[in-house]
C-alpha cells in the first residue's frame, strides 16, 4: 500500500481506523488526520505518525511500531489485548483504552440473557444467588441490576479487595459453593497474582457445590473451552451463556451447539457504546498532545 503519511507541516499526524464511528471532523482542526482500515496498517504506513486511534483489529506490537514516530495510541475499545503494553513501556509509547465505554450495553445484554434463560427454565431469578466475578465498570452495573431483581449477590474482585479492603467482597471459592449463576466480567491477565487466563478450568469445576449457569461476556480466554464442554457433558453446570470465545473468529462450534445462548461478541456492540469509546479516544489524544478539545 502506497499511502503517503509524511507530515507536510509541524502539526501532529494521527492515523485513525476508518471504521471508528463519529470521529471524522473532530480532530482535523488540530492535526493532520489520515483514515485507513485498521487491519491494513503496516510499519511503513505508521512510520511518520505521531498517534494512532485504533480498534482491536490493529495489533500494536514491535512489528508495527518499531522505528516509528508514534508517541501515543488510543484504542476506542474496552479491551487492550491488541496493545503490547510491555513493548510500549520500553519504547516510551503512551496508550489509553476506553474502559467502561460500553458497560451499559453489556449490562442490557446480561439482563436480556438472564431473563430469557429464566423464562426457558421456568425459574424465578429473585430466588437465586448470583456470583459476579470482576466488579469493575460492567460488574458494578451487573450487581445493581441483580440487586434490583431481588437476587442474592456475591462479589469477587481480588484486586479491588486488596486496594479497598474486604467490604462487600467474598472469595471465588464461596461463589463456587453458593452461586446458582456465575457471570464473569474480568480482563485477560495471562500471568501474575491476579491471572485470569483459563481461570475457568477443570479445577474450577471440581470445587462446584451447585450446578450453576455460567455466563461469559468479557473475554473468551477466561474459559478453557475443553473444560467447559466437559462440564456441560458431565452435568457439572446447568447451562452456558457465552458471547466471548476462545480463538475468535475461529470459535469452538461444538461448544456453540451446547450453549443455551451463544452470540458473536456483540454484548457491548451498540451505538451509544461506540460513541462513548470514540469520545474517550479523542479526549485521550487531546490530553496527551494538549490540543484543548
Where is each model-derived feature located?
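Oxidoreductase and adenylate-handling cofactor-binding alpha/beta cores
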Residues: 107-123, 148-151, 279-287, 292
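Phosphate/diphosphate ligand-binding glycine-rich loop within oxidoreductases
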Residues: 50-122
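Glycine-rich adenosine-cofactor-binding loop
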Residues: 99, 107, 126-147
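Phosphate-coordination loops involved in phosphoryl transfer and adenosine-cofactor binding
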Residues: 10-11, 126-129, 202, 211
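N-terminal glycine-/charge-rich "phosphate-binding" loop or analogous flexible N-terminal tail
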Residues: 1-49, 154
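C-terminal helix-to-coil terminal segments
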Residues: 97-101, 105, 190, 248-293
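NAD(P)-binding Rossmann-fold cofactor-contacting core
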Residues: 21, 148-165
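Rossmann-like adenosine-cofactor binding region
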Residues: 59-61, 160-253
Amino acid at each position: 500500500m502506497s499511502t503517503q503519511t509524511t507530515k507536510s507541516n509541524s502539526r501532529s499526524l494521527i492515523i485513525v481506523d476508518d471504521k471508528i464511528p463519529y470521529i471524522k471532523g473532530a480532530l482535523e482542526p488540530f492535526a493532520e488526520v489520515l483514515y485507513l482500515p485498521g487491519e491494513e496498517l503496516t510499519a511503513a504506513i505508521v512510520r511518520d505518525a505521531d498517534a494512532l486511534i485504533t480498534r482491536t483489529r490493529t495489533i500494536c506490537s514491535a512489528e508495527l511500531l518499531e522505528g516509528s514516530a508514534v508517541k501515543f495510541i488510543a484504542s476506542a475499545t474496552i479491551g487492550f489485548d491488541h496493545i503490547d503494553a510491555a513493548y510500549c513501556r520500553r519504547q516510551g509509547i503512551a496508550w489509553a483504552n476506553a474502559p467502561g465505554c460500553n458497560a451499559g450495553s453489556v449490562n442490557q445484554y446480561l439482563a436480556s440473557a438472564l431473563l430469557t434463560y429464566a423464562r426457558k427454565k421456568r425459574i424465578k431469578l429473585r430466588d437465586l444467588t448470583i456470583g459476579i466475578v470482576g466488579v469493575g465498570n460492567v460488574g458494578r452495573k451487573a450487581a445493581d441490576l441483580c440487586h434490583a431483581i431481588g437476587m442474592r449477590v456475591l462479589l469477587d474482585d481480588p484486586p479491588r479487595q486488596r486496594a479497598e479492603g474486604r467490604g462487600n467482597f467474598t472469595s471465588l471459592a464461596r461463589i463456587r459453593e453458593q452461586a446458582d449463576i456465575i457471570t464473569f466480567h474480568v480482563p485477560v491477565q495471562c500471568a501474575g497474582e491476579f491471572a485470569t487466563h483459563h481461570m475457568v478450568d477443570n479445577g474450577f469445576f471440581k470445587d462446584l457445590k451447585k450446578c450453576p449457569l455460567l455466563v461469559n461476556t468479557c473475554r473468551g480466554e477466561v474459559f478453557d473451552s475443553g473444560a467447559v464442554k466437559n462440564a456441560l457433558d458431565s452435568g457439572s453446570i446447568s447451562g452456558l451463556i457465552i458471547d466471548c470465545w476462545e480463538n475468535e473468529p475461529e470459535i469452538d462450534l461444538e461448544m456453540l451447539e451446547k450453549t443455551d445462548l451463544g452470540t458473536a461478541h456483540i454484548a457491548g456492540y451498540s451505538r451509544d457504546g461506540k460513541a462513548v469509546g470514540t469520545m474517550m479516544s479523542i479526549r485521550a489524544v487531546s490530553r496527551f498532545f494538549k490540543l484543548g478539545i
